[in-house]
Amino acid sequence: SRSGDVIGIKGSEVASFAKSLQRKLLLESTPHYHQERKLWNGLADNKRPAMIAQCIDTDDVIKAVQFATAHDLLIAVRGGGHGISGNAVADGAILIDLSRMSNLSTDLKAMTATAQAGVLLRELDTGAQQHGMVVPAGVVSHTGIAGLTLGGGIGINMRKMGLTSDNLLSVEIVTADG
């Protein structure tokens, strides 16, 4: 739970939630759970979420947030999983995994890019460079754009272009009430 207490959730409720997702819900007993819970930083890679919701769109995220809220579960969110501190995963939490939300599009006329939360910096850089654009962002290619932006987005172009977050035009967020 959010308070750290161990809580029980009926198996039928977990099964119903799993069926509602377009991708998978992983539990510790599920194949690939241990592979999917891992983070980039091995020093912070000892946390065990209660479940991993592999989301592919906003509707999946809404379902995961609503399930977590209904069951008083702590929520951890992972985009690229690059964060050094390991905060993208928490013991006993529902891990909302955004890594499969990786759609990216560019608007050459507006000179903008639209990226889902699971897009990695290497993908954004490649997409921008194909159109003669540059993204004011960091230099570590496996950093997720969502986490980079949430942290401000320090990068090599910031003196000329500002932080990544300075160039953010809009976001779609899911609040605690779904």
Question: Where are the regions a protein language model picked out?
Answer:
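N-terminal accessory segments
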Residues: S1-I154, R159-K160, N167
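Active-site and channel-lining beta-strand-loop segments
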Residues: L104, L163-G178
